[in-house]
């Protein structure tokens, strides 16, 4: 579990890889899949810092007409449900991620510390947070929150996490089915007009 995370480097234990190294590694192993006849790949991703880099790799592979690779993030597949379930969601360490882990790996969540995490973080995070005159003024998570947490984790439960997991799984299955139904040539870049 390592990705493009320099924006979290101020928090103990954060490990990250240089963006170019990450892209080259992902591209290399994806090309290996192509060697074995696989022509479609879904990168199942759970880290916002990886999104643009996975998409860049997908673009390179598609432009080379090697294979079609797309990035999928579980919470982006179910935004309405996430919005419905949580009053104060957040993009990092918030209730959606906490609830999902409470469902999948409850032993990793310290329920007795959720209020502390919330209180040391930023409960409300919106389009105006960390912006001045339309420009993002932050580069690192610590610029907005002392502990890296955004949202109110005390709203998380394993039951909510199960709802999110089941809904996201349905979306991933539907994406796999859609991708399998596509003609490979229709997934490639179109000719110049």
What residues fall within each predicted segment?
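Extended, histidine- and acidic-residue-enriched regions that form the cofactor-binding/catalytic faces
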Residues: 1-40, 48-193
């Amino acid at each position: 579990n390592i990705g493009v995370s320099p924006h979290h480097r101020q928090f103990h234990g954060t490990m990250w890889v240089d963006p170019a190294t990450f892209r080259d590694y992902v591209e290399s192993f994806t090309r290996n899949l192509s060697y074995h006849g696989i022509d479609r790949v879904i990168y199942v991703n759970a880290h916002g810092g990886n999104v643009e880099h996975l998409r860049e790799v997908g673009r390179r592979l598609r432009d080379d007409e090697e294979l079609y690779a797309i990035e999928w993030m579980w919470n982006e597949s179910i935004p309405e449900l996430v919005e419905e379930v949580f009053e104060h969601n957040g993009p990092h360490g918030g209730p959606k991620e906490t609830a999902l882990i409470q469902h999948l790996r409850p032993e990793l969540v310290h329920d007795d510390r959720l209020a502390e995490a919330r209180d040391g973080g930023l409960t409300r995070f919106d389009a105006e947070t960390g912006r001045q005159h339309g420009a993002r003024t932050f580069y690192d998570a610590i610029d907005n929150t002392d502990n890296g947490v955004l949202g109110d984790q005390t709203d998380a439960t394993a039951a909510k996490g199960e709802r999110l997991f089941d809904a996201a799984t349905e979306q991933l299955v539907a994406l796999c089915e859609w991708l399998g139904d596509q003609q490979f040539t229709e997934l490639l870049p179109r000719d110049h007009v």
